[in-house]
């Protein structure tokens, strides 16, 4: 699917990156504060579910030792393409976040995980494995959906601006279960989505020895729920 996350950076865009402070996004609507990257001097970074030829090349240009792990081979090919074009070194690994990560304990200084766990039903493995492969004092930067937006019918939110917004679903929203119950139909092109709860997202990190040291919210202004609150959350945790 062609969208904002599948368009690799151009040579000109990467030249701009070289001459400016690091600028990457975990969520829609806001860039990660550059101070987050200043909280470690380590340069070994894992971009988790982070393929597409965007963040990976930015990190490489900024002097990081970059590994990108993604389930999508086509997304990884975009990183390989940009790396070859620009003479950058990016290690690409095809992998599944729901399985053990193919890395040794305490390998990385930073894990950078843009919004993606909305497509994963059980977060337990992601946070356990992230903590395992992070070095002590390493940073986990993760973006995820604010669960409240899943209480509304997405078709009405996005495609029917004149219809009244009504609460429809309880949290945690699980589109696979709802489809099995005959309550919704999911377009296979987009896959199943899972809202999770703030407890599963935040406590999932804390109970694995990750302490939260910063946090922000951001907003996707392309839909009308954004008038009522922020629909994205990003957290910064440090491994104790």
Label each PLM-derived region with a short phrase.
Residues 139-179:
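Conserved class I S-adenosyl-L-methionine
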Residues 192-215:
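Short alpha-helix
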Residues 124-139:
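A short glycine-rich, Lys/Arg-flanked "PGG" loop and its adjoining helix->strand segment in the class I
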Residues 43-100:
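Class I SAM-dependent methyltransferase SAM/SAH-binding core
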Residues 109-124:
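A short SAM/SAH-binding and catalytic strip from SAM-dependent methyltransferases
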Residues 208-210, 224-240:
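Core SAM-dependent methyltransferase catalytic element
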Residues 98-111:
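A short acidic, Gly/Pro-enriched loop at the edge of an enzyme's catalytic core
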Residues 9-43:
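Conserved alpha-helix/loop element of class I SAM-dependent methyltransferases that forms part
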């Amino acid at each position: 699917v062609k969208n904002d996350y599948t368009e690799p950076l151009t040579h000109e865009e990467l030249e701009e990156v070289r001459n400016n402070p690091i600028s990457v996004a975990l969520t829609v609507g806001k860039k990660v504060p550059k101070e987050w990257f200043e909280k470690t001097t380590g340069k070994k970074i894992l971009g988790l579910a982070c393929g597409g030829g965007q963040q990976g090349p930015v990190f490489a240009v900024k002097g990081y030792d970059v590994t990108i792990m993604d389930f999508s081979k086509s997304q990884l090919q975009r990183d390989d393409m940009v790396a070859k074009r620009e003479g950058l070194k990016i290690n690409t690994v095809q992998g599944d976040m729901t399985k053990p990560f193919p890395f040794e304990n305490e390998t990385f200084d930073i894990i950078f995980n843009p919004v993606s766990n909305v497509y994963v039903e059980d977060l337990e493995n992601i946070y356990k494995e992230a903590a395992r492969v992070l070095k002590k004092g390493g940073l986990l930067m993760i973006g995820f959906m604010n669960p409240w937006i899943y209480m509304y019918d997405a078709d009405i939110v996005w495609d029917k601006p004149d219809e009244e917004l009504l609460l429809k679903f309880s949290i945690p929203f699980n589109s696979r279960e709802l489809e099995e119950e005959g309550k919704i139909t999911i377009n296979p092109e987009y896959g199943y989505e899972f809202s999770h709860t703030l407890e599963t997202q935040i406590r999932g990190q804390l109970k694995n020895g990750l302490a939260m040291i910063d946090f922000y919210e951001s907003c996707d202004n392309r839909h009308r729920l954004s008038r009522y609150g922020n629909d994205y959350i990003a957290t910064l945790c440090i491994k104790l």
